[in-house]
Amino acid sequence: NIDIRNYLVLEKIFQKYKNSIKLIIHSAAQPSHDWAKKKPFVDFNINALGTLNLLNLTKRYSYNAPFIFMSTNKVYGDNPNLLPLRELNSRWEISKKHKYFRGIDESMSLDNSVHSFFGVSKCYADLIVQEYGKNDGLKTVCFRASCITGPNHSGAKLHGFLSYLVKSSITKKKYSIFGYKGKQVRDNIH
């Protein structure tokens, strides 16, 4: 269990393995919006500084290793809420003719929107990953996913709604649904 804020501990790992590191998939994060608002300095240090630590060490010790960053759709702020959704029986969807029907790509602006503290810290991380790719030649990519779930998802109220919904159902605890008349807007990615 390594804290990505601890540069010296990370550096020992990179020094030990150097170019034998063939791929970096960076998915470490502080994922809670509410927690980020309560502790913005800690949130920024985990999401932004931790990413910067990994990028710098990749550049120094494992330059040829592709760097895959698990970002978030929260870097777009509230811009996705402005999309022209149409209501269906069980969910909201965007028109098949809309340029974002197959998903939002990097053409959607990160600017001129309201971000959460979490969104800002991940936005910084996302942008610095891009800069290391463009300016330093690292092989970088950012995946801006939404509603990620899986077998190790914590099922916490503040993040991970699908696993929390299942957990609430099993324990017969109340689960509150906010917005969009209780209909699904985003797809879950497993």
Label each residue range with its predicted role:
Residues 33-50:
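Short alpha-helical oligomerization interface
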Residues 2-20:
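Conserved Rossmann-fold cofactor-binding substructure of NAD(P)-dependent oxidoreductases
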Residues 29-30:
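Flexible cofactor-recognition loop at the NAD(P)H-binding site
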Residues 23-26, 53-115:
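Conserved Rossmann-fold NAD(P)-dependent oxidoreductase catalytic core, especially the SDR/UDP-sugar
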